[in-house]
């Protein structure tokens, strides 16, 4: 196959299934905002440090967006918004469903489905950049990929052109406490409100706030695995990202 044709579907786009979901005012607003901008050209794609989700270290080698991955990103971001649950911060669709409805899945001649284009975009770009957080699902599925829950972070909404004040406005009206949410599934660990507060603090106080947020986000066993050095590294990275973000916006 010629190199220029190695990508199937050069111009993917999100085409939701016919079962129309009832979308909240916030989701309608967010999807309108994201349709007006090019998420692949956001300054956040250059300003944020890519982080290895497993180790918390800055990735020394990181594949930035090429034109094909940028096209995939433009398709999958509105899809994630469409299936987003504002209460749980969860994208209520599997990676396979997102891939199918964005035209990012392929079938081989033998009938095997591949969702690599979508799954790699998430695991190799969106998650390291801090736009989403993923949690593996324990499953007995015989498929070739590990199913994951996808949570959208405050950074994701900044990517979509939604300001912290706007999302806080919607959250204060719509969000309801979910008692059954597991501790580690309570959204991304730093909220928009926290980010704004932390950005106005001196460095020592800001780092303390980030430390407390990390402790609340991870389980005791996860913190033990991370260790003191790993925790310090995570604080350094999050503080650096916060400084870069608000420096860009100021």
UniProtKB/Swiss-Prot annotation:
An annotated GO BP: DNA replication
Keyword Mitochondrion among record annotations: no
Keywords for this protein: DNA replication, Plasmid, Plasmid copy control
Function comment: This protein is essential for plasmid replication; it is involved in copy control functions.
Family as reported in the entry's similarity comment: Belongs to the IncFII RepA family.
Annotated protein name in UniProt: Probable replication-associated protein repA2
Organism: Buchnera aphidicola subsp. Acyrthosiphon pisum (strain APS) (Acyrthosiphon pisum symbiotic bacterium)
């Amino acid at each position: 196959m010629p190199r220029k044709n190695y990508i199937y579907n050069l111009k993917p786009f999100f085409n939701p299934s016919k079962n129309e979901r009832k979308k909240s005012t916030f989701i309608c607003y967010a999807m309108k905002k994201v349709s007006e901008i090019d998420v692949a050209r956001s300054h956040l794609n250059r300003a944020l440090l890519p982080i290895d989700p497993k180790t918390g270290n800055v990735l020394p080698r990181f594949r930035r967006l090429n034109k094909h991955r940028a096209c995939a990103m433009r398709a999958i971001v509105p899809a994630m918004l469409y299936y987003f649950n504002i209460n749980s911060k969860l994208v209520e669709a599997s990676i396979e469903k997102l891939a199918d409805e964005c035209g990012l899945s392929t079938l081989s001649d033998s009938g095997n489905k591949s969702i690599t284009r979508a799954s790699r975009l998430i695991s190799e770009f969106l998650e390291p950049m801090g736009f989403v957080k993923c949690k593996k699902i324990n499953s007995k599925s015989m498929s070739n990929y590990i199913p994951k829950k996808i949570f959208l972070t405050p950074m994701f909404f900044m990517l979509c052109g939604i300001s912290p004040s706007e999302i806080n406005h919607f959250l204060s009206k719509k969000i309801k406490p979910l008692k059954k949410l597991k501790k580690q599934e309570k959204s991304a660990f730093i909220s928009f409100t926290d980010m704004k507060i932390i950005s106005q603090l001196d460095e020592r106080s800001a780092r303390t706030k980030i430390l407390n947020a990390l402790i609340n986000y991870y389980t005791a066993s996860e913190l033990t695995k991370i260790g003191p050095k790993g925790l310090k590294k995570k604080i350094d990275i999050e503080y650096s990202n916060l400084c870069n973000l608000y420096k860009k916006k100021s």
